[in-house]
């Protein structure tokens, strides 16, 4: 805990009161939430960034897309457009943001839309001729103007929300009591060898009455480019430049880095300027450049196709994935029947 955060404690206390009152007014229906007549799953967290929302949304897409018409709705963080945008084949990453662009690129079966006003976003999606049967709301745990039918709360194993405090003293967007809105909690970025005892201790600390699942990040065995894939084990041995623009890059970097590699770290969702691209070209020269899948969406077209690669990740559950899948599918099927 640094000195600046200590002196900001009074500000955090005021922020805690404001966010608590906001939730209280929604809970008591003084502030109104809008419901929609279809299954809506909201995925989010209580803390700021880096909990692994993107691979979790992708897990849900893979689970649902073969049997349901799926749409994702995101705010479109750092995009250069306003209002509702539905992705199509001419859409660019600048128009919808890196994460939605990644969804659109990887999952051609689904609809991908962005809109900061989620009520309007859902309304526009439901006006489509081939409208979705289920909507996944990305980073929407605090977006209480919409009442989703199912809430998935994410928290990282190394930074549980129950050990944190409200901004700016800590990293929480709202008091940890917000956990009571969750229908399910997923503890992300767990070590592969986590013990049953450690899982039990985490569940006890979280102190919730909903199912708790544990997931880890799995790195692909291949790194990809617009030209050809290469084995990850092979590229680890080469001297390379690693570029990240994500919230918590250390695991990604440590998975790939060897002693002489150059690492360039940028802020989360960073929009690269021409000067920065030119600097990357100069520093990397003829070396392989490897980045995250999200950053690749923003860097491709600016760097050499032969030089630029990305390493995909997935969310994998350490146990009871079938139980989680059944809970989600049961909700969707039951909600669909009632709509």
List PLM regions with ranges.
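Hydrophobic residues at beta-strand termini and immediately following loops
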Residues: 43, 73, 155, 215, ...
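C-terminal accessory "lid"/substrate-recognition subdomains
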Residues: 2, 160-288
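Short, flexible loop segments at boundaries between secondary-structure elements
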Residues: 220, 267-270, 306-334
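Short, polar loop motifs at secondary-structure junctions
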Residues: 75-78, 139-142, 246-249, 292-298
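Walker A (P-loop) phosphate-binding motif
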Residues: 23-89, 191-192
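A transmembrane-helix-recognition feature enriched in membrane-embedded lipid enzymes
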Residues: 1-39, 331, 335
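Residue-level signal for inorganic ion chemistry
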Residues: 14, 54, 103, 138, ...
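Phosphate/Mg2+-binding loops and adjacent switch elements
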Residues: 77-79, 83-205
């Amino acid at each position: 805990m640094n000195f600046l955060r200590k002196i900001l404690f009074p500000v955090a206390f005021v922020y805690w009161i404001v966010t608590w009152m906001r939730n209280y007014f929604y809970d008591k229906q003084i502030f109104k939430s809008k419901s929609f007549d279809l299954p809506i799953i909201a995925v989010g967290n209580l803390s700021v960034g880096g909990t692994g929302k993107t691979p979790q949304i992708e897990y849900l897409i893979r689970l649902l897309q073969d049997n349901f018409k799926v749409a994702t709705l995101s705010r479109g963080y750092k995009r250069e457009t306003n209002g509702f945008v539905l992705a199509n084949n001419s859409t660019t990453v600048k128009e919808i943001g890196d994460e939605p662009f990644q969804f659109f690129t990887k999952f051609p079966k689904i609809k991908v839309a962005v809109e900061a006003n989620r009520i309007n976003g859902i309304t526009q999606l439901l006006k489509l001729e081939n409208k979705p049967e289920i909507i996944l709301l990305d980073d929407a745990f605090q977006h209480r103007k919409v009442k989703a039918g199912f809430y998935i709360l994410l928290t990282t194993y190394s930074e549980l929300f129950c050990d944190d405090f409200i901004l700016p003293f800590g990293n929480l967007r709202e008091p940890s009591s917000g956990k009571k809105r969750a229908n399910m909690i997923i503890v992300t970025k767990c070590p592969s060898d986590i013990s049953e005892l450690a899982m039990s201790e985490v569940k006890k600390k979280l102190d919730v009455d909903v199912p708790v699942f544990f997931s880890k990040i799995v790195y692909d065995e291949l790194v990809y480019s617009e030209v050809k894939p290469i084995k990850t084990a092979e590229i680890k041995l080469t001297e390379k430049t690693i570029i990240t623009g994500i919230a918590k890059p250390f695991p990604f970097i440590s998975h790939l880095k060897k002693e002489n590699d150059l690492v360039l770290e940028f802020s989360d969702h960073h929009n690269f300027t021409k000067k920065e691209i030119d600097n990357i070209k100069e520093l990397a020269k003829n070396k392989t450049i490897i980045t995250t899948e999200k950053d690749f969406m923003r860097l491709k077209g600016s760097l050499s196709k032969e030089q630029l690669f990305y390493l995909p990740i997935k969310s994998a559950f350490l146990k009871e994935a079938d139980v989680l899948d059944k809970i989600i599918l049961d909700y969707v099927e039951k909600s669909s029947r009632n709509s």
